[in-house]
Swiss-Prot record:
Coiled-coil residue windows: none
Metabolic or biological pathway, per its Swiss-Prot or TrEMBL entry: Cofactor biosynthesis; coenzyme A biosynthesis; CoA from (R)-pantothenate: step 4/5
Free-text function comment from the UniProt entry: Reversibly transfers an adenylyl group from ATP to 4'-phosphopantetheine, yielding dephospho-CoA (dPCoA) and pyrophosphate.
GO biological-process terms attached to the record: coenzyme A biosynthetic process
Assembly and interaction partners: Homohexamer.
Site (Transition state stabilizer): 16
Gene giving rise to this polypeptide: coaD
Subcellular location: Cytoplasm
The keyword Cytoplasm is assigned to this record: yes
Keywords from the named record: ATP-binding, Coenzyme A biosynthesis, Cytoplasm, Magnesium, Nucleotide-binding, Nucleotidyltransferase, Transferase
Residues reported in the UniProt entry to bind ATP: 8-9, 16, 87-89, 97, 122-128
Gene Ontology cellular component annotations, sorted alphabetically: cytoplasm
Protein name: Phosphopantetheine adenylyltransferase
């Protein structure tokens, strides 16, 4: 059975990855479908988001990424998918998603919507939250995969962290020196 996991993924978060991984255990193929939405100005282009998703999900052999325009139901039919996969963080998500599922059902009776409750640790997480934190110079390392964090820091042109190209381990951005104790500054300079 083929499932479509549609969204903007601008950027993909650990919450998205949680749904993708869990969906990959339930379905033969999960297609992470990036909507080209001309009414939004994204942080990353569709092509950049597709590359980010492919890199993030390369360990999942039954997951692929693709871009699409138009109605999700039409795209699902083109890809011969039977299921739309959606993540739910809160009751407010459920109300919106249920309405969307009912609307999609009026467009195609052949496609079902399957909801997965987001894992507790990601129940607050959205791409908008990630961008808002990064916009004001906060760390997003714990919210997105390491390579995505680097891309985000570059976009916002902050003192973004550096990554070891071999391990992709992130060295956090320098703290505001006014909040760092003198011993920490000395230790940082010694290393």
């Amino acid at each position: 059975m083929i499932a479509i996991y549609p969204g903007s993924f601008d950027p993909i978060t650990l919450g998205h990855l949680d749904i993708i991984q869990r969906g990959s255990r339930l379905f033969d193929l999960v297609i992470v479908a990036v909507l080209r939405n001309p009414s939004k100005v994204p942080l990353f282009s569709v092509q950049e988001r597709l590359e980010q998703i492919r890199r993030t999900t390369k360990h999942l052999p039954n997951v692929e990424a693709d871009g699409f325009d138009g109605l999700t139901v039409n795209y699902a039919q083109q890809r011969q998918a039977q299921v739309l996969l959606r993540g739910l963080r809160a009751i407010s998500d459920f109300e919106v998603e249920l309405q969307m599922a009912h609307t999609n059902k009026t467009l195609s009776t052949q496609i079902e919507t399957v909801f997965l409750a987001t894992s507790n640790e990601y129940s607050f997480l959205s791409s908008s939250v990630v961008k808002e934190i990064a916009r004001f110079g906060g760390s997003v390392d714990h919210l997105v995969p390491p390579h995505i964090a680097l891309d985000i820091y570059k976009c916002y042109n902050h003192n973004y962290p550096t990554a070891n190209p071999t391990t992709m381990e992130i060295t956090p951005p320098h703290q505001n020196m006014a909040t760092v104790a003198p011993q920490e500054i000395l230790q940082e300079q010694e290393t």
